[in-house]
A protein has these predicted regions:
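A membrane-topology feature that recognizes alpha-helical transmembrane segments
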Residues: 1-182
Length: 182
């Protein structure tokens, strides 16, 4: 069996035609595309200028919500309409709480990036969210160590400031791939 969005399990043999088979498998990954595109754009901007544009996050969240609605209707699982935004908001609130523990460690852009990526990861369910947070921790620590060691901007205003959006986005990709393929 193949694990689809939100834990729906279907056998490839259960589809009534090759077309439905292809749509189901392709749609699984297309559903995450809005957050992926937004995440890549935001990561590049965070690396270059240490800012996460809120407008880009808003557009990415809106596009991902549309994808969530489409998937929920196609899979006939309206719980997805609650699950994805709930995990996204909970993750963003947790990230905001963590950033308040040590002020200056993470900015509001990292919190909004977590919200946008949380919509995609939240579609994959609780296991994906847990894997995402573990991957965020591990990749974040590795990214921080590498960035501080090889900082290409060490002679600029941004010296010593680590952009965390790439770690958040990479962890989201790892979590979605790990939980949908396994």
């Amino acid at each position: 069996t193949h694990s689809l969005i939100a834990g729906i399990r279907t056998s490839p043999c259960s589809f009534d035609s090759i077309g439905n088979f292809a749509i189901s498998y392709v749609m699984t990954y297309l559903a995450y595309l809005p957050s992926l595109i937004c995440g890549i754009a935001v990561s590049v901007e965070d690396i270059r200028l240490r800012r996460v544009p809120r407008l880009w996050i808003a557009i990415g969240c809106l596009a991902q919500l549309v994808a969530v609605i489409i998937v929920a209707v196609m899979a006939n699982t309206m719980f997805l309409l609650v699950q994805a935004p709930l995990f996204a908001v909970l993750s963003a609130v947790l990230q905001a709480g963590l950033s308040m523990v040590k002020p200056g460690s993470m900015g509001f852009g990292d919190v909004t990036c977590t919200l946008a990526m949380g919509l995609a990861v939240g579609m994959a369910g609780l296991t994906a969210v847990v894997v995402w947070w573990l991957a965020m921790g591990l990749l974040g620590l590795a990214w921080m160590a590498l960035w501080l060691r090889f900082d290409p901007q060490r002679r600029s205003d941004h010296a010593g400031k680590v952009p965390f959006a790439p770690a958040i986005v990479c962890a989201a990709v790892v979590a979605v791939i790990a939980t949908t393929l396994l």
